């Protein structure tokens, strides 16, 4: 069936971040829509950020394009160009390998909801503000020097 029942898709706030970097995403709740729909060529997540929560640590991907569509509420997009308020209906796109680290932060007093679309990639992910890096083909993040957390 093309229409997805969001309530039937498990919601989680799991993260692969090490504890020292995980606090800001504890209020991020997401559903992986692509597996539920049988989609294989790209990933889609339905994301709700509680007040104060971030979508991720600020990051950029070498081999993954990303697109975000705000469905409800308000978040602040923080990237190398500064800060941009994102409201219902706004769209942001992040081209792979552009070097522009980005994150959505919910600074409001109400939840916000968005859909994030990307492509599963086995390429590096850079985190410019913290000592963390996802190396291509690696199983989880490591410090920028390659050492384990």
Predicted features and spans:
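Conserved short histidine dyad/triad with adjacent acidic residue
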Residues: 29-32, 45-61, 98-99
């Amino acid at each position: 069936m093309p229409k997805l029942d969001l309530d039937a898709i498990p919601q989680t706030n799991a993260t692969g971040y090490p504890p020292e970097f995980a606090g800001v995403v504890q209020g991020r709740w997401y559903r992986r829509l692509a597996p539920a729909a049988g989609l294989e060529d790209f990933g889609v997540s339905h994301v709700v950020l509680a007040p104060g929560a971030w979508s991720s640590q600020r990051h950029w991907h070498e081999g993954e394009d990303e697109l975000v569509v705000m469905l409800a509420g308000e978040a602040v997009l923080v990237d190398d160009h500064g800060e941009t308020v994102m409201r219902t209906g706004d769209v942001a796109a992040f081209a792979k390998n552009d070097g522009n680290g980005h994150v959505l932060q919910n600074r409001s007093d109400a939840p916000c909801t968005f859909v994030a679309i990307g492509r599963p990639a086995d390429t590096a992910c850079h985190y410019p503000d913290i000592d963390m890096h996802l190396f291509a083909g690696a199983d989880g993040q490591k410090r920028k020097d390659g050492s384990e957390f």
